[in-house]
Amino acid sequence: MQNELIIETINLVKDYFDGDRVIHALRDANIKIYRGEMVAIMGPSGSGKSTLLYVLGLLHPPTAGQYLFKGQDILEYSKEEQALFRNRELGFVFQSCDLLANSTVFENLELPLIYAETDRQSRRAKILRALDRVGLSHRVDHWSNRLSGGERQRAAIARALVNNPSLILGDEPTGQLDQKNTEIVIEQLRDIARQGFTVVLVTHEDEIGAACDRIIRIRDGAVVSDGLENYIIPQVVKRSPKDMISVSEI
């Protein structure tokens, strides 16, 4: 259902403590993100954008505030419930692809299914479906260390998708890719959002922000603007899918 509210944060605070010094990484962050959106979180280095992403991913607990996921305050869950929720509802893509080098693509994608207690009989079908979404089903039994850089990151996206999560979180997912592979990965993420997944990316690249539906800007831990119309990107235009490089070209 389009316009379904997936994420709502209410006065979200994250503080870090360095001796007697308090570092305010997030200050009363209030955001809403809907199903099928591809949203960029942007801001200067040290602004709190990655902190917000990690709080949304339940990797860093907030100091105060509420985090509602489909209307449920998941901060009230036990640690065990949060871990199960994270494995089933969230998918992660990081800047440095962390596939296990001495394992096959299948074995890498099987791990989150094992953690989510998926029965063995259905795992291969789920893995092939996820790989097909990024054009890599033909690599399912290949060693991950034999993949190109772009293929490894696409396999990482497939791994994020394998449990059919509601939310994909990416922390600079194209940071180590060249321009050609960056365009491929971003268009694949846009296609994933069009299929009803919600995609949230931390990025410092204006062109990636321009490819998103919306930009949330953060400065000094505070949300200072929310919406593409509030963020002017000079000499960058939003590309249509036909302008992007196709997967078959690599």
Give the ranges of each region predicted by the language model:
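ABC family nucleotide-binding domain
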Residues: 5-218
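Short, low-complexity, intrinsically disordered N-terminal peptides in bacterial proteins
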Residues: 1-2
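Conserved beta-strand-loop-alpha-helix hinge in the C-terminal portion
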Residues: 222-248
